[in-house]
């Protein structure tokens, strides 16, 4: 499965013009009541098909651009349309009556419609640099190194907003507090999930819970990291600490949501005195599926389902996209399965987190981040294909909870140049390099030169003394870079399995809480590609929100992350 491109053009709701004069007062009152007397496009946007069959939505409109909607202009447009309609329709008025009535009904449906199918994608840590680096990488690698950007499925969406992310305690928030803001419309402290700040004694109900209870929507939650991690948990759990993993797992089972998929619970056995999280879910009526074949066999009508990915990697999360084996399910596959299991006449809400973008950026692994953004784009494309079949009932939102790593496109030693094609030589994430190679180096005290042969094979970085040095191009290491790598390698062997407990402040500034050698390798290939990071933590940068579908226009402009909840609540009518 995994991210097939759609060849269908993106469809937009049509405007219907028959007998508009009768409905103009009602429509105007509705626009006023809903706060629509601002800037709004009256006509559907043009569509074309982008390269490789991708839908590409151009931000231009038929007939007119955007206009300030006043009562006078609103009535002018309506009166003109009514006059034209009466003159042209008079000879065949009787024959056209049934079609006109149907058009009226469709027009009213469009004016008052609410999204029946809601997709919310959260790229954890996905700031604008993460998105743009993926676009640049895609464009240059698909065009023989040319300086051109590629399109992602969601960067073609017609509406774009900019979102602030700070929480009650910091301008550089964490995922628990930011996901709480998105899910409930409330600020809280870093590390707290859906509880009021400071006292932590009042739970906040989430948009997913309200849609489930008040509107009978089916609900799904997907994450490429642990299913009880902060972001997915913020749609079903209420905890004073994001580290209450077992209790979060119990809340998952008690939520009654119809579909969960992702990595393993972080403390699946709790304190060992009670049932594990799998057993708790099964007792609550969930089908607990732990194999890919079992997940593939699920069909609509399967009932409440919890899928734990079969192929687990670092931290019992799903693999980075660049590390996934051929045929291994990725985010796209779980989105497709979620759509299949959730689709129903009442509607659904599906939250999907690409959590390993954040993990990659914490580790300053630019290539891993890029590949996970590209995989998230594939997952969004699956939702776009669903939208194409339900254009008047579907809303797709793509955003981030915060930015991670302070990613920058541009580096001191490359000046105004970037060489993103260098990143094609990186064959695996830092995490897979650690588990496949570095753990063995530590155990066996492998010589530096031997380790560098593996670095060449998996990252392309080549020592000046290598027999193939003349063919290394821009990945040939300078003496300065070799010395930095050697120091990091020696420090790795010194620290060994004890990890950060023996690391100094200087170590932290150089390598964060990660294995020094792996970080030095990532930094080196990043810098040679023209990329850098400022931190191993989160930043306070604004993030983008991309929207398409019913109510998408509400998400344009600049607003706080709490407004995402409030806009969704207004659109769906939950209290």
Predicted features and spans:
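Cationic, low-complexity basic patches in intrinsically disordered or flexible, solvent-exposed regions
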Residues: 6-9, 13-15, 20-21
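C-terminal segment of N-terminal export signals and the immediately downstream linker at the start
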Residues: 89-118
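Active-site-adjacent structural elements in enzyme catalytic domains
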Residues: 114-130, 135, 199-214
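A post-motif C-terminal structural segment
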Residues: 115-117, 126-131, 136-180, 229-575
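Extracytoplasmic mature domains of secreted/periplasmic and thylakoid-lumen proteins
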Residues: 187-250
